[in-house]
Design a protein with these regions (language model features):
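Nucleic-acid-binding surface
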Residues: 3-6, 13, 17, 22, ...
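A short, conserved structural fragment
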Residues: 25-31
């Protein structure tokens, strides 16, 4: 389990006891202020990123990879945050700012083997695929689209249409999705 220094102190630990547990191998330092309570714990970077930036949502190529919609391993973690959020200053993160009116639409906590990540559901990712079509390499766009076609029975089209109503260009997106799927 990943826990912060603040979380450890809330559990009654002191800075001294934290250092002692690190020395004894009972805690493992992941990054400044973040620890693993199981020294042998193996977790994905997505899980750590979700824990470190709880208000950010894993989206885009990172989310497509998590869902197995593409075999392309993203170079960066693609995170969505609300407009006017503080910038995430990490070399391995690409941050996109989204309008608060649709930022939370379709957010779920997805269980992975390594832990839980905050991402979008399939319906919202399908919208993101078409909404940001020009930002993805053509080969990856068509690979993800092909994957969506294979799992179209898992997509809740009623929910998809409800989501599309929140976007200003929802009708044109709906038409494009309907033609493609």
């Amino acid at each position: 389990m990943i826990i912060t220094t603040k979380g450890l102190i809330a559990l009654g630990e002191t800075e001294y006891s934290i250092r002692k547990q690190l020395d004894d191998g009972k805690l493992r330092l992941i990054e400044r202020g973040y620890y693993s309570t199981d020294p042998d714990d193996v977790f994905g970077n997505e899980v750590f990123i979700s824990k470190k930036y709880p208000s950010a949502i894993i989206t885009g190529l990172s989310a497509f990879f998590i869902y197995g919609l593409t075999d392309f391993i993203p170079e960066y973690f693609h995170l969505a945050t609300e407009q006017h959020s503080f910038p995430i200053r990490r070399d391995d993160v690409k941050q996109s700012y989204q309008d608060p009116s649709f930022f939370e639409v379709g957010v779920i906590d997805k269980e992975l083997e390594e832990g839980v990540v905050r991402t979008y559901d399939l319906e919202r990712l399908l919208i993101e695929l078409f909404r940001l079509r020009t930002k993805y390499p053509q080969e990856i766009f068509y690979q993800v689209l092909s994957s969506f076609r294979k799992i179209k029975d898992q997509i809740d089209f009623y929910k998809l249409n409800q989501y599309l109503k929140r976007f200003s260009n929802g009708l044109s997106l709906q038409k494009k999705i309907k033609e493609a799927i």
